[in-house]
């Protein structure tokens, strides 16, 4: 069993032994984002995320079209699909408002990234561009998401309190991962 820090990717995984050491002795690999508590790690070695994709309900999150030029940010690698709106005048949304499972330490701060939308992003534009790309893996991924009724336009809503964090920030769940949106030239990473 491995604890995957982000979307079961191959980088950032932590071995059974390391999870065991953390759960029993509080020891965690130095350069890896550290969960706030061993209690947030399930028996399967994965983070136990809140229900409803971490949205504070009511109200339910609403589907939107991300407009060209909109700025976004996130902590973590590009394999995730959750971002926050970034507004120059307000600056970075405070970490505790994001209800993330990891400690706000140097390893986590190194994962912070910002992005800009290069064109409007919604369910239709993503599906159209994926079909045009001829990328069989992405085409199959969209088919599977549709079958599970999990393919949607970006959803925006308030973040629920979780992981001993206050929440109350705003999050957006993208239709596919940041990495996939970058591959399709929907968004780019910015300084």
Regions found by a protein language model. Give the residues of each.
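Catalytic toxin/effector domains delivered as secreted proteins or via bacterial secretion systems
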Residues: 2-191
